[in-house]
Amino acid sequence: MEKLSEKDKGLIRDSWESLGKNKVPHGIVLFTRLFELDPALLTLFSYSTNCGDAPECLSSPEFLEHVTKVMLVIDAAVSHLDDLHTLEDFLLNLGRKHQAVGVNTQSFALVGESLLYMLQSSLGPAYTTSLRQAWLTMYSIVVSAMTRGWAKNGEHKSN
């Protein structure tokens, strides 16, 4: 498992300090980018009749609730940088939930790319190569646990 250095943790915490206070607007940037990268992902949000296209989806209350939840997961990861393993059960379950609704693991990579895009567009010149790498490392730890949960859920369905 990858490890975060103390420097990485500091970079992540410092960059998240302002972003975490405005979760929904930054989450909308993340999801706007995600839907630009793969518009087909819109079909996964069938709980809302307002998800015919990205702008409709991004303004629906149900979807904004999902945006908030995603940003809270990022917030939890940042808050637990010293002990990310304590989120293991939560992340395994999150992976299972994503598998159950038809999300494939390749989409996790697109979310990571969209997260980096949001960070870059929000932080401007403060977005450095070191900061990017720190966030990539943290995200890979989170996604690794989610992927294990996703795979376990798939095993249970095939048995």
From Swiss-Prot:
SUPFAM superfamilies: Globin-like. Residues 3-151 form the Globin domain. Keywords: Cytoplasm, Heme, Iron, Metal-binding, Mitochondrion, Oxidoreductase. It is found in: Cytoplasm, Cytosol; Mitochondrion matrix. Its EC number is 1.7.-.-. Detected in brain, eye and gill, but not in muscle and blood (at protein level). Particularly high expression in the periventral zone of tectum opticum, with significant expression detected in white matter, preglomerular nucleus, posterior tubular nucleus, torus longitudinalis, hypothalamus, pituitary gland, posterior tuberculum, hypothalamus, synencephalon and formatio reticularis. Detected also in brain regions of the visual system, predominantly in parts of tectum opticum and torus semicircularis, area dorsalis telencephali and medulla oblongata. Changing K23Q: Reduced membrane transducing activity. Loss of membrane transducing activity. It catalyses: Fe(III)-heme b-[protein] + nitric oxide + H2O = Fe(II)-heme b-[protein] + nitrite + 2 H(+). Induction: Expression is significantly up-regulated by severe hypoxia in brain but not in eye. GO terms for molecular function: GDP-dissociation inhibitor activity; heme binding; metal ion binding; nitrite reductase activity; oxygen binding; oxygen carrier activity. GO terms for cellular component: cytosol; mitochondrial matrix. Heme b binds at H66, H98. Monomeric globin with a bis-histidyl six-coordinate heme-iron atom through which it can bind dioxygen, carbon monoxide and nitric oxide. Could help transport oxygen and increase its availability to the metabolically active neuronal tissues, though its low quantity in tissues as well as its high affinity for dioxygen, which may limit its oxygen-releasing ability, argue against it. The ferrous/deoxygenated form exhibits a nitrite reductase activity and it could produce nitric oxide which in turn inhibits cellular respiration in response to hypoxia. This is Neuroglobin. It comes from Danio rerio.
